[in-house]
């Protein structure tokens, strides 16, 4: 029986016309082929309300064995699987629904740990020739809210991965809006990110197999 992996990326936001996470997920889906793995993919809204709601709907609709949510982060030059989601939201800019919330997300604990083997994900991405490192900061924007929803709305293996906010032929504006480390640039391409996500999907599937 194949392992079904749900992977999501995000739509553009903050004045950008692209989002590296959504682009990478779409490229991965076009080329992914494995008889032992079923890949379900989606691009979800950059919305504190709509992002988590869409993820929960996808989980209910597809009944995945594993959930991997992906977002982009300005200022990062490596693929960074996140260690935990925090119970906090701080919107430096409005989301795509013009919402700018602040405060706790839910009544749960301050931190919820990823239910994926983060060290194994890092090793798999590096083995594919892409720089990777673990991260202790999923931010306080919609990425963290969706990560939190994956952990609270799904009982199985679930986690979140940030990819660098790369663009084709220009610089992402999102970095300055959401990440204090925005000046850092990455030489990675969308195809490189798809390669990294391929490795992550395969490594994550061992958690749900």
Would you name each region that the model predicts?
Residues 138-168:
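Active-site oxyanion/phosphate-handling segment shared across diverse enzymes
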Residues 1-140, 151-155, 183-209:
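N-terminal catalytic or cofactor-binding beta/alpha core of small enzyme domains
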Residues 174-184:
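A solvent-exposed, charged loop/short amphipathic helix patch at secondary-structure junctions
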Residues 15, 167-173:
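Short active-site-adjacent structural elements
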């Amino acid at each position: 029986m194949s392992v079904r992996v749900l992977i999501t990326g995000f739509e553009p936001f903050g004045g950008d016309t692209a989002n590296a996470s959504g682009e990478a997920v779409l490229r991965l889906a076009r080329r992914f082929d494995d008889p032992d793995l079923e890949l379900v993919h989606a691009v979800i809204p950059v919305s504190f309300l709509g992002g988590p709601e869409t993820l929960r709907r996808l989980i209910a609709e597809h009944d995945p064995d594993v959930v991997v949510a992906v977002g982009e982060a300005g200022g990062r030059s490596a693929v960074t699987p996140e260690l935990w989601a925090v119970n906090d939201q701080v919107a430096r800019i409005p989301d795509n629904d013009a919402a700018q919330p602040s405060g706790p997300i839910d009544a749960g604990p301050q931190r919820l740990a990823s239910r994926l083997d983060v060290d194994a994900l890092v090793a798999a991405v590096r083995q594919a020739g892409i720089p990777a490192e673990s991260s202790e900061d999923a931010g306080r924007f919609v990425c963290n809210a969706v990560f939190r929803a994956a952990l609270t709305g799904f009982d199985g293996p679930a986690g979140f991965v940030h990819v660098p906010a790369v663009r084709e032929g220009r610089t992402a504006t999102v970095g300055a809006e959401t990440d204090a480390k925005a000046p850092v640039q990455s030489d990675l391409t969308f195809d490189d990110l798809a390669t990294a996500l391929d490795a992550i999907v395969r490594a994550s599937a061992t958690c749900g197999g």
